[in-house]
Amino acid sequence: MNQIEQKWQYIWQEEKAFEVSNASSKPKYYVLEMLPYPSGKIHVGHVRNYSIGDVIARFMTMQGFNVLHPMGWDAFGLPAENAAIKNNSHPKKWTYSNIKNMKKQLKSMGFSYDWSREINSCDPEYYKHEQKFFLELYERNLAYQKESFVNWDPVDNTVLANEQVVDGRGWRSGAIVVKRYLKQWFLKITDYAEELLNEIQNLKEWPEAVRSMQEKWIGKSIGANFHFKIKDNEETTIEVFSTKPETIFGASFIGIAFNHPIIERLVSKTPEILAFITQCSHITRSSELEKAEKEGVFTGLFVTHPFDSNIVLPVIITNFVLMDYGTGAIFGCPAHDECDHELAVKMNLSIKQVIKADMDVQKTAYTEDGILINSDFLNGLTSNEAKQEVIGEFEKLGIGKRSVNYRLKDWGISRQRFWGCPIPMIHCEICGIVPVPYKDLPVTLPDDVNFDGHGNPLDHHPSWKHVNCPKCDKPAVRETDTFDTFFESSWYFTRYCNSNATEMTDKKACDYWLPVDKYIGGIEHAVMHLLYARFFTKVMNEQNYVSVREPFKGLFTQGMVLHATYKDEHNNWLYPEEVVKKGNEFFHKESNNRVVQGRIEKMSKSKKNLIDLETMQEQYGADAIRLFVLSDSPPEKDLEWSASGIEGCSRFINKLEYMFKAIDSLKDDVNSEVNKELNRLVHFTIKHVAEDIKHFALNRAIARMRELSNAISAEISKDKIDVKTVRHGFNVLVQLLNPFIPHITEEIWQKLGNKERLYNLSFPAFDESMLELDTYIMAVQVNGKLRDTYEFKTSVSEDEIKQVTVSLPKVQKFLEGKEPKKIILVPRKIVNILV
């Protein structure tokens, strides 16, 4: 099988089978799988993703479309830098070696990529365009620098990504990670929050789950911003944001984030306060803060109620108010908010009910809307009426106004890493921040770098960062941060339209190809990559790089590939190939010690539940792997890897070769009867396989083709064979299977004597008239119970059906000589005789 696959891969390469032109009279179709990170090896999860895309690409080509199906590499990132530290070598060497190997693997799977459009995000010829784009954003005030919290490893003296913080400690040093303010670069994605939110409803071909996740991530909240005066210091106020300002008369405290600026200005830092701030700063993710047990510490400050100066509220530092949401301060209404209630119970704060409820708010917060009580001028109003009224009062008093807040925050793009695209800015003591002139782009990474694992190598480099200021020509320093790698993947799909364009995009080519018709990838990218790509497309549209404002017309999110996990007696993870099954138990192949089978989980390096692709290819071939990952489960569902499943797919491919040999040896028999049912099934399969592929029901399409192959095999085994229909049916079967298993089908097609390649052929056509059955079978019931079945010709009338079924011996037995009261017909399905 490997020889056949290599043969066709060579032919496709020599014939440039999948290279497409930007100038074609055919309608366009752009199918794209999310580009991979070059980690070194393609894994089975990749194969499933790319096999889905390949079926769609090949099918749409057969449907007469000019199909763009490109591939490239998301090549910057932390793993390359970690490998550089480990091996004391440049990450470029590691990355390019991995790309070479993975490209070879992708070609060996027979994927129909247009490799002439390949992109590599760590190539200066690629990232010079995004450096220029960043400068354009800066000119439009869409890029800016400010201080922000980062995860700081005090031993390695470096910033850590969230995934590098394990149980609150640095992954390399083991040091307790702290929050630290550093200057970071941001993009103003929040300027586009409303458009990003509103246009979600137009993404009709996106999964509802992804659309919902983006809506929640953007998180639009309508409420009010207003001020509380500090008691005994009325010149100073704390501004809060609330989505429920109508509950103001239920306020019992002010909650502020642990890093709220007023703490530095007015709060005396007692040991208790310092300890609490430190505790909060060790939590590295906002999601962890939100899930944590609600805690707080009193600051010693009080504020006065905006509508009653006799009411004073304590100001409390909490671990659930976040500085990057709203204003970093809230008023706590424990009776009507769960977080506030939990803290109030713990700190013995008052719980005052201000919305009618048939429950005890001292025990549980009532969080629904209702009628206001205990609320002065708001009493008797509905929640919505009270909200409008109280905001009006804030505006009259000049202490607040209606406001809209978004959970979405500006995108922090700074990474204190080496292996990324350099941010093209210069810091001058005289001129401040100065953009690198366009003529000096790209700013490239140095080759002579020391990777000792401590700090950012760019910051420590003896010469790279030192440069003269473009404005005053005095000594200055380069920005040593690099772009978040999501920067590269937020526009790469536009580059495929013409990967040799001298500018960021070829506008004419983008006008032809964009938007991407079908984008395929994991749902884990719903609120990061997919949102950033939508944001970039809108800005690129305004910069006249593209005409569209949405990048992906259709989105398909495939399920994960799963495998059982195994551990030995010492609790060490084992690879599947190290384990053998004997009866219902598992044992280590070498030691023969008992092995414990764990949960079936997503394949991962850490748990070693991986399948080596190259081993599988040697054993079964690429076509069998492709067929298995597409046939065993709907593409949107998770797929459990099974040896028996891929063996079954391998047998099916071998069966196709056997069928070819058997059919090739047949001689025409003019006396054989025409197998109308087989002919009908051929046309039925053509029609429904096309529909299944269009709806991504690829496993169902494969099941239909297996059914057709079984019917052809059954006909071959007869004494009198309808050779003409068998040959036609087999030809159709080979064509239908080609998008799924392209190597063996091209080989069989050639052996059948065909000169043209399958990849150049149109999808088989079906004849609608052939789908009609000459006969059909109806269930015959008496008083709703099945008593017989009968085969009728399609031309029979309802009266004839009634006469025939009533006279059937098995029916007569239950009629007992009585006349039917009524006969109910469900056309072509059921006759129900009532007596």
UniProtKB/Swiss-Prot annotation:
Keywords: Aminoacyl-tRNA synthetase, ATP-binding, Cytoplasm, Ligase, Nucleotide-binding, Protein biosynthesis
EC number: 6.1.1.4
Enzyme's top EC category: ligase
Residue ranges annotated as motif 'HIGH' region: 36-46
Motif ('KMSKS' region): 602-606
One Pfam family this sequence matches: Anticodon_1
Reactions catalysed: tRNA(Leu) + L-leucine + ATP = L-leucyl-tRNA(Leu) + AMP + diphosphate
GO-annotated molecular function: aminoacyl-tRNA deacylase activity; ATP binding; leucine-tRNA ligase activity
Annotated positions binding ATP: 605
GO biological process: leucyl-tRNA aminoacylation
Location relative to the cell: Cytoplasm
GO CC, any one term: cytoplasm
InterPro entries: aa-tRNA-synth_I_CS, aa-tRNA-synth_Ia, Leu-tRNA-ligase, Leu_tRNA-synth_edit, M/V/L/I-tRNA-synth_anticd-bd, Methionyl/Leucyl_tRNA_Synth, Rossmann-like_a/b/a_fold, tRNAsynth_Ia_anticodon-bd
Family: Belongs to the class-I aminoacyl-tRNA synthetase family.
NCBIfam families: leuS_bact (TIGR00396)
Protein name: Leucine--tRNA ligase
